[in-house]
From Swiss-Prot:
Residues 42-58, 222-233 have a biased composition (Low complexity). This is Ubiquitin carboxyl-terminal hydrolase 9. Present with 98 molecules/cell in log phase SD medium. The keyword Transferase does not apply. Its EC number is 3.4.19.12. Belongs to the peptidase C19 family. Residues 1-76, 194-273, 726-754 are annotated as: Disordered. The lineage of its organism: Eukaryota, Fungi, Dikarya, Ascomycota, Saccharomycotina. One of its GO terms (molecular function) is cysteine-type deubiquitinase activity. Coiled coil: none annotated. One of its GO terms (biological process) is proteolysis. The gene is UBP9. It comes from Saccharomyces cerevisiae (strain ATCC 204508 / S288c). Keywords: Hydrolase, Protease, Thiol protease, Ubl conjugation pathway. It catalyses: Thiol-dependent hydrolysis of ester, thioester, amide, peptide and isopeptide bonds formed by the C-terminal Gly of ubiquitin (a 76-residue protein attached to proteins as an intracellular targeting signal).
Amino acid sequence: MIKRWLSVNRKKSHPEKNTQGNDEINRKATSLKKTKGSGDPSIAKSPSAKSSTSSIPSNLASHERRSKFSSQTDNLAGNKHYHEHYHNMASTSDEREYDSSTTYEDRAFDTESSILFTTITDLMPYGDGSNKVFGYENFGNTCYCNSVLQCLYNIPEFRCNVLRYPERVAAVNRIRKSDLKGSKIRVFTNESFETSTNSGNSNTGYQSNDNEDAHNHHHLQQSDQDNSSSSTQEKQNNFERKRNSFMGFGKDKSNYKDSAKKDDNNEMERPQPVHTVVMASDTLTEKLHEGCKKIIVGRPLLKQSDSLSKASTTDCQANSHCQCDSQGSRITSVDDDVLVNPESCNDAVNNSNNNKENTFPTSEQRKKAALIRGPVLNVDHLLYPTEEATLYNGLKDIFESITENLSLTGIVSPTEFVKILKKENVLFNTMMQQDAHEFLNFLLNDFSEYIQRNNPRMRFGPQKTDNSNDNFITDLFKGTLTNRIKCLTCDNITSRDEPFLDFPIEVQGDEETDIQKMLKSYHQREMLNGVNKFYCNKCYGLQEAERMVGLKQLPHILSLHLKRFKYSEEQKSNIKLFNKILYPLTLDVSSTFNTSVYKKYELSGVVIHMGSGPQHGHYVCICRNEKFGWLLYDDETVESIKEETVLQFTGHPGDQTTAYVLFYKETQADKTENQNENIDTSSQDQMQTDNNIEQLIKCDDWLRDRKLRAAANIERKKTLGNIPEVKTAETKTPLNDKKRNKQKRKSRILSFIK
């Protein structure tokens, strides 16, 4: 069953079968063949169908109705395409390379779990991405960007629209982005965090992309020089030991020269670790993570190392040529002459926890573990070079890289997206801390303009008309406010509509604000008098008037901006207001202008600002995932939290961690009423999300463990192949057989008889 999830349609990808991308995909897909035995995590069979269903955006429904291919036909075709992927990948040319991994007694997942299988269509041939949990790498005060992108990804309607439009190349010629390393491979080890001093906040903890590259290059040059000198000396010592050892006796010196050249090539090809700085732990960040239930991205590598050690010990006992240490741990080969312990790759995380085995890992330790554990998807270039370098295409590449990756968890490095952002808006091209709301507003407007410009290409299916005005950004986020100004002299009323993509929540003085009370019957009244008199077109003069603001149209996704930042005349700068602002999990919104304007919302995401002012601080976000419940995203790390933790960031002078942007998603009134009637619904939902998280972690650990053991087995083969005794035994065996066959021939006359 696991083959269906981790493979590519070999039949449809035949024109590109010789490309490097498909070879890599085939190797990874065939490494997950079903085998019998014990060792895999047991996962309860999900009662769901073969593919989980996700919410369909409002504008998509109209597209699919107009399309001659109905949604059922689309799903059937997608499922057929999906099954062809994973059936055809069972037999590939690279199967021989990973076939030895079946010696480890692993049992594949015999389940139709929604964690592995998601909704697929012709426009989303690799699923809708609802089963992926990825963190975002911070490139230097980019936490404002990471938090907003995480909230948008966890809105199914937004994510599916970005994945579907504009339509990519046909599925026949499309290559799955199973493992995106980028132009510059980002590899993190324990040494990656030793060259710089960690900083306490995100302002000083990172550098810009350009500066970071130069900074990394400087350190890499130093590390390369040190590594080259030490590695050269080590190679010479290894050659001397081999020359004096029994295994190396009688070996030609030219072989050593060839081996040295091979080692130099391997050293050049092996990617050097990236040197970076992660945000140091402090009381503010540790208090934020107090409500953590389960670490998803950033958990230690203990499970992988333990299982790898057990499998390696078993293999060592079965193979006399495999070298083991005193503890029975497996020794694998990195190159021809240097043997290392595979458990050393976990020391970066385990060393930091040696003295805290029974304590919860800090946020700094989790971020280091997440970067080392990987995979790190470095999206540092446009995946389709012929397309325009826009923010929309950059975000689409990020979403596709997450959705199509073979791993369930990991980290994304949005290098190209941040680069495009700094080019599109010079206000973000600085090392200063940026405003998350300003970024969200600019992003949605930029997306809307891009869709309007490319509207004919954004159509669903084969029916593409030029007279269509569909724009899923406006369909999801656009609302309308009505301004009515009544002249108190002639009673003339002037009306004007104002669209909005995010709704402002004003903060007045030291007052407490209740969002539910404010939006239950929303209206604002203001008297226009004195210097603010209104010019009446009927009276032809400035008159006193009354202005009323109400809601005319409500959006599907209601984003609320809590205006905590304001300019202070006394301090001559922007300050942060710590007024208490209450926000509910379910929100009722209506208008006094029109009683028919009414919608019920449920909280979907919260962007949180940590700090005493707008010029500095740190952004994190809390999102409600459709499969895994409430998740806390802190740049590289992701963890599940309790529902009551979501409502704790209301703000007060003693707490600098406050909610800043709220995302509410429209829900059906009947659904909420049924939930109120059924007391056990919330507990059942909580049990389901907890079970999904357990499945996610077990699946992810199993896949990573499988990959490590397959790689270790290949390295073991290389090591055994370089041992002269093994080579001699392999070469002598066929010769002895030939001699025995010749000895059976007693007469040359009858030698033609076999």
